[in-house]
């Protein structure tokens, strides 16, 4: 049983058929949200085709919620699949991180900076 199993529905920001969304307990930015599978699976690669299709619906709904709630329009969307990719909770979840002007000195490269020092390419 994962830590996500203990999350009360009262904490859900929204839900789709196969996912629910909460605000991250340790947000990187204001509004940082987690899209979590209702079925306990390890990572993205264990989702079935219906869940993968519904994930797109959940991402769009989360985006709409964040735009409405926080007035943001830029996002990083990410999944850590496996220990060496940084996954620490082994129950599928997708991070949706709102980005704002000035939240980092130079945002170019975005998720490429997951490996320190390898993000720049120019």
Stretches with model-predicted labels:
Residues 1-122:
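HIT superfamily nucleotide-processing domains
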């Amino acid at each position: 049983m994962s830590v996500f199993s203990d999350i009360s529905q009262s904490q859900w920001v929204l839900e789709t058929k196969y996912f629910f969304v909460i605000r991250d307990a340790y947000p990187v930015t204001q509004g940082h949200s987690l899209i979590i599978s209702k079925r306990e699976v390890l990572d993205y690669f264990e989702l079935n085709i219906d869940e993968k299709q519904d994930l797109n619906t959940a991402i769009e709904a989360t985006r709409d919620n964040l735009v409405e709630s926080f007035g943001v329009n830029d996002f990083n969307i990410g999944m850590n699949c496996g220990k060496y990719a940084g996954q620490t909770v082994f129950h599928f979840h997708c991070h949706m991180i709102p980005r704002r002007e000035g939240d980092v000195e130079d945002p170019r490269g975005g998720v490429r900076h997951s490996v320190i020092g390898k993000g720049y390419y120019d």
